[in-house]
Amino acid sequence: MKTLAHPDAAAEIRTRILTLTPSDASQWGIMTANQMICHVREAYVYALADIPVDFISLPFPPKVVKHFALKLPTPWPHSTTTIPQLKLDAPGMVCTNFDQDRDTLLASFDSFCALTNHTRDHPFFGTMQHSDWMRWGYLHADHHLRQFNH
């Protein structure tokens, strides 16, 4: 399984981010390429921050959702829900220009990849160990890069 704990997988995601262009069209959903990089950036920032997590109620227990999302070799479904802080109209969701936003995404990505013992709760998955976060970090970026055919 690919995870950001493996340098090759982290380099793959970084390269795919660098190949994005502002004119890339979404294969699903409503985001533009620039909005997507802002969303992914803020997801890493949120994961890095020491702020309270508001749990999202799902029809299955968090452990089950986490297992399906992080352990099974299937892509995440299109247009899944997100936490309010990562929605396009969230107060902290500020997109400026594509190149600048991509640079800040790469900075937050690099900070996230540099973590060595990250544990905190996730709004959907509950308790997460460092290995879970590194897997999530890969899968979340991969999901949105595939959204833009990268």
Region roles according to the model:
Residues 49-104, 112:
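Short, helix-capping/interhelical loops that line the mouth of catalytic, cofactor-
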Residues 1-7, 17-18, 25-28, 77, ...:
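Globin-like tetrapyrrole-binding proteins
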Residues 12-23, 45:
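Short amphipathic alpha-helical segments and their helix-coil junctions
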Residues 23-71, 111, 115, 119-150:
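Short, contiguous alpha-helical
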Residues 12, 39, 104:
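Charged catalytic carboxylate motif
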Residues 11, 102, 119-121:
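A short alpha-helix capping/helix-coil boundary motif
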